[in-house]
Amino acid sequence: MKLDDIKISRAIVEGYMEDLLDYMEMDVAIGGGGPSGLTAGYYLARAGLKVALFERKLSIGGGMWGGGMMFNKIVVQDEGREILDEFGIRSEPYDEGYHVADSVEATSTLCSRACQAGLKIFNLMSIEDVMIRDEGITGLVLNWSSVEMAGLHVDPLTVRARAVIDATGHDCEIVKVVERKIGPELNTPDGRIQGERSMWADVGEAALIENTREVYPNLYVAGMASNAVYGAPRMGPIFGGMLVSGRRVAEMIIEKLK
């Protein structure tokens, strides 16, 4: 077969535009493609919801790829291991309650299984704003990451969603935008972002599940964004809480939307 360069380009452009137009409106929009966002996307899509994930970087997986200080191993607890088992990610016991997995296998498998479940991922897109109406958050305002990086003055486009998840990690970027736009109206003790505390894995992991919640109407936080918003410690390269947080936020949204 003789290959046609223009036909290759046309296939890419047409295929991408079909996806982008299809996801102008959806059930759930996820900001951030780390472990909690991917896990949430997997469970939401598997439940039959229309869900897309927007990641500003080229690669998906957040900080999971690098394990701890570039030693590409991660640790999970018993509950996190249950999720690894469900995804088919291998792990080895280290001590009672501690399980070690290969970070590259874990990250790539999370991404693959989430996509196969029906999650649509748009990488290289940054979330620069939200849509807020009387009923709460109704969508995201998007631009190419390259536009943001180059500092170009280019207006964004919008997508509509019935629920939004901030899974952007330590920076809790979507919640920051909401706080900046509306002031101290968040579902926190003083209505503002409480700020992430210093490393304490035991306390941070326990707090993470409690802090996975609806922080503003139709806006949920998961993963490290949860602890950053609610003032709990960071945890380092233990990822069980991140996986469980992703599953938990999916369960909350499924219960609300289904």
From Swiss-Prot:
Its cofactor is Fe(2+). One of its GO terms (molecular function) is pentosyltransferase activity. The keyword RNA-binding does not apply. It is an enzyme of class 2 (transferase). It holds the Pfam family Thi4. Pathway: Cofactor biosynthesis; thiamine diphosphate biosynthesis. It catalyses: hydrogen sulfide + glycine + NAD(+) = ADP-5-ethyl-4-methylthiazole-2-carboxylate + nicotinamide + 3 H2O + H(+). Fe cation binds at D155, H170. GO terms for biological process: thiamine biosynthetic process; thiamine diphosphate biosynthetic process; thiazole biosynthetic process. NAD(+) binds at S36, E55, R56, G63, I127, H153, V154, D155, M224. Its EC number is 2.4.2.59. InterPro entries: FAD/NAD-bd_sf, Thi4_fam, Thi4_prok. Glycine binds at R234. Keywords: Iron, Metal-binding, NAD, Thiamine biosynthesis, Transferase. The keyword Nucleotide-binding does not apply. Homooctamer; tetramer of dimers. Belongs to the THI4 family. Involved in the biosynthesis of the thiazole moiety of thiamine. Catalyzes the conversion of NAD and glycine to adenosine diphosphate 5-(2-hydroxyethyl)-4-methylthiazole-2-carboxylate (ADT), an adenylated thiazole intermediate, using free sulfide as a source of sulfur. HAMAP family: Thi4 (MF_00304). This is Thiamine thiazole synthase. The gene is thi4.
